[in-house]
């Protein structure tokens, strides 16, 4: 599935034109995750659909969702901008930036310098880079370009091998472990438990995907995660603020 998505993305890049630049005060993703009021930092995601789960919500209001996430204690907002597979939109980034005071992470399949430029133009504070989508050297080049544009990066790995290749080139400031197996699309927080021991102490660690219960959060916290990225579990709930409260139940997490 990843290869199919990347092939589509390369076709989109060939036709990409930079939008007019949006100007917003920059907010640090890393700093915001470090000063959370919750047991772990929370990147709450706005996602209408996904290839593995289909449509999560028939209609969405990114601004309304972002506002509720902020009220619930989120440290940052992740915004899906891929149209073809996730029904996202780059316009959502500016809409959310205008609504909340939190940093906004652009979640997409970033493969080229032009997309980094686009990310800076649309007003994001940070962007996702996926280790499984490119060689570590190419990822490092995009990472350096992003930081030169005032953007932070969440660098995502799916395996010990990907992390090992990445660390041979450089150590990202924020590393994400995706709990989804890209071959089967099944999720398990055991992925974070297995890979976290390889993450350098100086990097901030985010556990992504497949987090559905307070026990899942307790497990990744024990494994060394500093933050979690949660999308589907929140998007499926009518009361998203209560969903955050339920997931981050102190008594359950600190058992």
From Swiss-Prot:
It catalyses: 1-(2-carboxyphenylamino)-1-deoxy-D-ribulose 5-phosphate + H(+) = (1S,2R)-1-C-(indol-3-yl)glycerol 3-phosphate + CO2 + H2O. Belongs to the TrpC family. Pathway: Amino-acid biosynthesis; L-tryptophan biosynthesis; L-tryptophan from chorismate: step 4/5. This is Indole-3-glycerol phosphate synthase. Its EC number is 4.1.1.48. GO terms for molecular function: indole-3-glycerol-phosphate synthase activity; phosphoribosylanthranilate isomerase activity. It comes from Shouchella clausii (strain KSM-K16). The keyword Lipid metabolism does not apply. One of its GO terms (biological process) is L-tryptophan biosynthetic process. Keywords: Amino-acid biosynthesis, Aromatic amino acid biosynthesis, Decarboxylase, Lyase, Tryptophan biosynthesis. HAMAP family: IGPS_B. The lineage of its organism: Bacteria, Bacillati, Bacillota, Bacilli, Bacillales. InterPro entries: Aldolase_TIM, Indole-3-glycerol_P_synth, Indole-3-glycerol_P_synth_dom, Indole-3-GlycerolPSynthase_CS, RibuloseP-bd_barrel. It holds the Pfam family IGPS. Gene3D superfamilies: Aldolase class I (3.20.20.70).
